[in-house]
Amino acid sequence: MSTITEYFESLRGKSIAVIGMGVSNTPLIRMLLRADLKVTVCDKSPRERVEEQAAELESLGAKFQLGPDYLSKLYKFDVVFRTPGVSPNHPELVKAAEKGSPITSEMELFFQLCPCKILGVTGSDGKTTTTTLISEFLKEAGYNVYVGGNIGKPLLPDVAGMVPEDMVVVELSSFQLMTMKQSPNVSVFTNLSPNHLDYHHTMEEYTAAKLNIFTHQQAGDRAVFNYDNDITRSLSRQAPAGMMLFSRRNKLEEGVYLRDNAIWLTNDMGSREVLPLADIRIPGVHNIENYMAAIAAVDGLVPDKCVRAVAQRFTGVEHRIELVRELNGVKYYNDSIGTSPTRTMACLDSFDQKLILIAGGYDKGVPFTQLGVEMTKKVKTLVLCGATAPAIRKAVEEAPGFAESGLEIVETSNLAAAVAAAQAAAVPGDVVVLSPACAAFDQFKNFMERGKVFKELVNAL
């Protein structure tokens, strides 16, 4: 393992392209420029949209390739740093690779240089909560913990100060994993269901990307899989190193499971109760699964008393079944992280009454058939907005039992109108939930902005 200084020295005299000026790549660009390396920033935004950021990087020596043709000359560079948002299968990246340019990324470089243990989490749902729980468990046990990937901040600027005794916890998306050539020391696969098919095109490509979280593991490493998910249970047989399963529905001979209203763990040291379910403060059976995954990840690293201490105070992550307020006897919840049908179904399962649900958003090419069935059972009023509103409506109206369900469907033009419609439909005792089952890109920058706007709208009622 080289140091970051040695790595930068190996790039001296080479032409470097960095695709994108996003959250993870901008610190990388600064580091490369401060090492006096030749960097060209390639970004699809026109100069006027990124003027302030571009001016700062230009003052450090950056050159730019901006606008719609920002990828057109990648093949001329000696090294290309990819942004997760651009697929490695993009024709211009393929062309650059064929010409001999190494294609890498900020996260791949971090893995290459990191001196300490890395725990990584991927899956279709539950990544952020599981990542957060793992990091909180480790902090409670006294470790110096760095959190990054899809959450937290870019880790590369901190790598020079890390020591072998530290811990790194990263949330990894399929976009990041596609080209990874190293796996975390502990990898967690929460579950897998159709998602991001607008990017990956097929479920097979999506699954193949996710596999990199454990494919490159070495002896002594561990991979954690969800036994209750058909795909991850099958993938667990491919784990090249240590493996641990968790299951909410089945008692396992070895692994993490439920028994007597508590989470238990059985390994070669025996069986023990780790966490009473009564200690968990966040709602939903899916969050029990998130706890199980995190407990499996830290087994042997964190005493059980630390797990219990975290559970007794942890109230969840923003935008995940987050109570916004109670107004006139009606509770309003923000579950903007519900960016897929499976997430929204998990949200519906977290309540013991029929909901007023606000759903719809950007179309990722994911089917809504099963969600439609669940909505007829668990939703009293469905308020739709966004690009997918017609597709969700169709799935609900074609679901068995829709005619008898009494489910009312309201279509609105935007989130503000949807909140107003939900308030109009609500009576004391009702629960209104934003859980869109879709990404936010049709009307918002991301799910966080959507959740923030929702909370502002609700607090203004």
Residue positions per predicted region:
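N-terminal leader/targeting and accessory segments in enzymes
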Residues: M1-S105, L109, P303, K394
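Residues in the short beta-alpha loop(s) of Rossmann-like NAD(P)-binding domains
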Residues: G22, S45-R47, I151, D228-N229, ...
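Beta-strand->loop->alpha-helix junctions that form or flank phosphate-binding loops
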Residues: D43-S45, Q65-P68, T104-E108, P240-L258, ...
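C-terminal helical cap/extension that packs against the catalytic core
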Residues: Q53-A55, Q370-G429
